[in-house]
């Protein structure tokens, strides 16, 4: 059962569900909360590798996959007044402005905006589930499948999240996992481990 707008407001008021900054009531719609785009983007650079080998990246000593991030990607931060252009065929990572903390008995579902999708913007490539016990900003996996560059601006409404009540509290929520690699994330770093 998904939470309706009234229930979302109650959960926020009781701090059972935490969204920072707290959304105004006009951003809580029916069964979703609108999410805004932050100002951090991770772009994929041109590189000389013939392919990406997840086994190799996963096996780096001490999971030093950060070298992969810095050799093949670059995180940029723009001001609130700047624009970011996503060109056709490009994949870029970005973040929601909001940090979200989900309790152990809820699961979140991220959706892109239909009006943006009609111009070719995919907001999340595959990962739209936000696990029970999650805390942090949500990474967005933008892809422009259209024919023209798409202009993105910090603070624009980029998608929405809904919340579904579980039958009980999870016994293995995300925040209690030993390998919760993205817990409390505030950046777009790619951490490759436990893939193979």
Curated annotation (Swiss-Prot):
Presence of the UniProt keyword GTP-binding in the record: no
Top-rank taxon: Bacteria
HAMAP family noted in UniProt: dCTP_deaminase
Assembly, per entry: Homotrimer.
GO biological process, one term: nucleobase-containing small molecule interconversion
The protein's name: dCTP deaminase
EC class of the enzyme, as a word: hydrolase
CDD domains, alphabetized: trimeric_dUTPase
Alphabetized GO MF terms: dCTP deaminase activity; nucleotide binding
EC number, UniProt record: 3.5.4.13
Residues where dCTP binds: 113-118, 131, 139-141, 174, 181, 185
Matches recorded under Gene3D superfamilies: 2.70.40.10
NCBIfam families attached to this UniProt entry: dCTP_deam
Organism name: Wigglesworthia glossinidia brevipalpis
Family: Belongs to the dCTP deaminase family.
Pathway as given in its UniProt record: Pyrimidine metabolism; dUMP biosynthesis; dUMP from dCTP (dUTP route): step 1/2
Catalyzed reactions per annotation: dCTP + H2O + H(+) = dUTP + NH4(+)
Pfam families the UniProt entry points to: DCD
Keywords: Hydrolase, Nucleotide metabolism, Nucleotide-binding
Signal peptide residues on this chain, from the entry's feature table: none
UniProt-annotated catalytic positions: 141 (proton donor/acceptor)
């Amino acid at each position: 059962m998904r939470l309706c707008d009234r229930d979302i407001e109650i959960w926020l008021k009781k701090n059972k569900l935490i969204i920072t900054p707290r959304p105004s009531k006009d951003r809580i719609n029916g069964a979703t909360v609108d999410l805004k785009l932050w100002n951090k983007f991770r772009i994929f650079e041109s590189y000389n590798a013939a392919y990406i080998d997840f086994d190799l990246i996963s096996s780096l000593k001490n999971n030093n996959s950060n070298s992969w991030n810095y050799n093949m990607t670059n995180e940029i931060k723009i001001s609130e007044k700047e624009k970011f252009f996503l060109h056709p065929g490009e994949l870029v990572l970005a973040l929601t402005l909001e940090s979200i903390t989900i309790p152990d008995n809820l699961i979140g579902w991220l959706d892109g905006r239909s009006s943006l999708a009609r111009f070719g913007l995919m907001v999340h490539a595959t990962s739209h589930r936000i696990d029970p016990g999650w805390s942090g900003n949500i990474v967005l996996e933008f892809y422009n499948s259209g024919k023209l560059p798409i202009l993105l601006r910090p603070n624009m409404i980029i998608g929405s999240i809904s919340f579904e009540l579980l039958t009980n509290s999870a016994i293995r929520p995300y925040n209690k996992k030993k390998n919760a690699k993205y817990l409390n994330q505030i950046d777009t770093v790619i951490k490759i481990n436990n893939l193979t």
